[in-house]
Structures are given as structure tokens and as C-alpha cells.
């Protein structure tokens, strides 16, 4: 009769079985923790009470019950020596007993966990997607099987444009170079499922003679599969179409620095903490570090998208030494020309200061004398200009050090006034005065 009633009873569902197993597992884990605490408590109590008892008995025996015979004293000392050994033996027994209990508890816990894992695998095989997902989220949240169930949804097919050839490339041809997955047991069905579910996303529309066009972006999981190690995380989809660019002007330093590199950076004072990062303006990739002094004046080409990033500022350039010497010569020539122009009006004023009576009494002889005087003045002016040109040529040939080494005051006194200061036309003024006196 009991067998018939047992057959008529309905079997418990998987959720009920898992709930019961979850409760048993929790109780076993609590018992294990409690057993560990009890072992520590009992061992500590044993040591505490045994030491107190040992001290009290030794004091009482020594003060009141110390025997007088030699054999009795030896027996009492032997008992006092055996008491610590007895306590140590009791401690080992307690530890063995509690360890045996924990081993039995752990065995039962492992059996329950194995049964639970087996039931969850059956749920993955037999139950529907929705029910299996609910059960796994409730009883096994840390499992990776939930991610296996979340397959990507295939996107709509791409319609070709008129006048263009549709090139269909299967996902298997594109993902030949994909590396093996991390989980070997679960990687092959996942990759095959993704490849079978996303054939439409791998289509490209391209016209003959034109660049390929991509209108649909792949799913994140397919991106994860197609991404190779070493490629930047912020790569643009159209960057794969660009041809490889020129090589970099400078090598990119590795991120991981060794102990020797750190010591050298500390001694020299040149490390990542003293540099600025070179970030590409287009793909925002890291292209190494630059010094603080050179950061604003550095122009670089990105190592990933080959975009030329211009410098933030232009470096100021110092003028050349030849230009400085030419500027000095120009200033000197300008000052000398102004002095010459002042001399000529002075001579004209002296001639015009003659009285009108003398101008009326001019004879042909006086006109000839004036013409001779004018020729003499012109010759003097030309000689002064030649001397000034020679001085300028000597100044241009000499270096700046020769200019700094000026002659002594005694030598300046011995030299004539025209050579010491060529800008002062003293002889010309004296000769013009003498000629004016002769005409008078």
C-alpha cells in the first residue's frame, strides 16, 4: 500500500530539489564554521584551566602536603612532570575529533555541490531558455553558462545598390585567423554559434573601382572575436581600409619599465612623471611621451591611424650673427651719410653770406677761382668717402672679438682725428674757411 502511495505522489520539481539542496549546503557550511570556532574555544579552555590547576596543586603540595621521605618526594615530582604531557595528549585528541567532524562535513558538502552541478547541467539540456535562465540566475549566479545562452541577434540583411556588385564573404573566411578561445571546452560551440548567427553582418557593398562601403557595424561579441591582441581599443572601423603609413620618427617606449630603467630615471630625472603623453587627435591613441620643454613644439604621426598631429606652437628662432653685423654696418653708414649731408649745406651757406656788392663786382677771374674752390671741396669729399668705405670694409672683415679689443688712450692721441673718429670732418671745415678768406 505504501509503495502505491509513493508511486501516486508527484515528483518534486527541479526548483524544489535545488532549494532543498541549497538549504543543506548552507547548513553544512554553517556547521563547518561553527566546528572551527568550537575547536579553538575548547583548546583554549583546556590550556587555561589546566595551567591554573597545575599552579594551585603545586603550591598546596609544596606548602602543606610535602612528604618527608625521599621516595615520596620523587613520586610527587614525577606526577607533576607527567601532568603537562597528559594535557598535551588531551589537546591532540580534541583536535583529532574536531578535524574528523570537519572532514565528514566537507565530504557531505562536496557531494551536495556535485549533485547540484549535475542538476544544473540537466536544466541546461532539458529546460527551455527562459526557465533555464531563471534557474541559473537564482541558484548559480556566478556561472558563465548564462553568457553562453545570450547569443547575438542577427541584424537585417543589407540590400545592394543598383549598379553595384554584392560581394558576400562568409564569417568563416574572415575569422580564419581568429585565435583559440580561453575556454577550450566552451569556445568551439560559442564561435560556431556566433559565426552561424551573424553571416549578414559580414557583407560589404563595393563598386568596381571604388572604395568599399560599410553600412552595418558588427556586434560587440563579433568585435571581441575579431580583435587581435595589440590592436588599440578605440580603433575606428574605417581605419582598416587605410594603407600602412610611414615608419615612426622615434620608437614608442614600452609601458612596463624594469628596475634598471627606474633607477636610471631617478638619477637622471627623466621618467614618465616628468613627461606629457602624446594623444592622437583622431583616434585618441597613446603615442608615447614627450618632455615638458618639447611638448608644445612636437609634431608627430599616429602609430595606429597614421594621422599627422601638428605642433601646438612654432618654435622661436634666434637671428643669425651675420644679420647682426650687417645691421650694425647699415646703422654706421646711415649716420655717416647724415653727417655728409650736413656738411654740404654749411658750405653753401658760407658762399651765400657774401655781400651783394661783391656779387655785383664779380669778374671772370673770380668765377674761375670759385670753380677751382668747388672742385677742391668735391675732391676732399670724395677722399673722405673713400676713407669711410675702407673703414667699413675693415669692420666687416674683423670679428666681434677684434671690435671688443679697442686701442689704448695713448694710441688714440697719436692717431689723427680723421682715423680716430671718421664721422668728424675737421679738415674739410678748415679748408672751406681758408678758401672763403681767400675769396674775400
From Swiss-Prot:
Keywords, sorted A to Z: Coiled coil, Endoplasmic reticulum, Membrane, Metal-binding, Phosphoprotein, Transmembrane, Transmembrane helix, Zinc, Zinc-finger
> What's noted about post-translational modification?
Phosphorylated. Phosphorylation at Thr-159 and Ser-325 occurs during interphase. Phosphorylation at Ser-177, Ser-179, Ser-188, Ser-192, Thr-198, Ser-206, Ser-215, Thr-219, Ser-222 and Ser-231 occurs during mitosis; these phosphorylations reduce both its homodimerization and the ER three-way tubular junction formation.
- Positions carrying Phosphothreonine are 159, 198, 219
Alphabetically, the GO molecular function entries are: identical protein binding; zinc ion binding
Q: Where is this region: Disordered?
A: 149-169, 202-247, 316-440
Q: Which InterPro entries does this chain map to? A: Lnp, Lunapark_Znf
Q: What membrane topology term does the record carry?
A: Multi-pass membrane protein
Sequence positions bearing Phosphoserine: 177, 179, 188, 192, 206, 215, 222, 231, 325
* Biased composition range(s): Acidic residues: 370-411, 431-440
Ranges in the Cytoplasmic compartment? 1-45, 99-440
The principal localisation class reads endoplasmic reticulum
Q: Where is the composition biased (Polar residues)?
A: 216-225, 334-343
ZnF (C4-type) intervals? 280-305
Gene Ontology BP terms: endoplasmic reticulum tubular network maintenance; endoplasmic reticulum tubular network organization; positive regulation of endoplasmic reticulum tubular network organization
Which superkingdom, per the lineage? Eukaryota
Protein location:
Endoplasmic reticulum membrane
Where are the membrane-spanning stretches? 46-66, 78-98
Q: Which GO terms describe its cellular component?
A: endoplasmic reticulum membrane; endoplasmic reticulum tubular network; endoplasmic reticulum tubular network membrane
Q: Does the keyword Endoplasmic reticulum apply?
A: yes
Q: Which residues form a coiled coil?
A: 16-40, 100-128
Describe the family membership recorded for this protein in Swiss-Prot or TrEMBL: Belongs to the lunapark family.
Note what the entry says on domains.
Answer: The transmembrane domain 1 and 2 function as a signal-anchor and stop-transfer sequence, respectively, generating a double-spanning integral membrane protein with a N- and C-terminal cytoplasmic orientation. Transmembrane domain 1 and 2 are probably sufficient to mediate membrane translocation and topology formation in a N-myristoylation-independent manner. Transmembrane domain 2 is sufficient to block the protein secretion pathway. The two coiled-coil domains are necessary for its endoplasmic reticulum (ER) three-way tubular junction localization.
What is the documented function of this protein?
Endoplasmic reticulum (ER)-shaping membrane protein that plays a role in determining ER morphology. Involved in the stabilization of nascent three-way ER tubular junctions within the ER network. May also play a role as a curvature-stabilizing protein within three-way ER tubular junction network.
Q: How does it assemble?
A: Homodimer; homodimerization requires the C4-type zinc finger motif and decreases during mitosis in a phosphorylation-dependent manner.
Name assigned to this protein:
Endoplasmic reticulum junction formation protein lunapark
Q: What phylogenetic lineage does the species belong to?
A: Eukaryota, Metazoa, Chordata, Craniata, Vertebrata
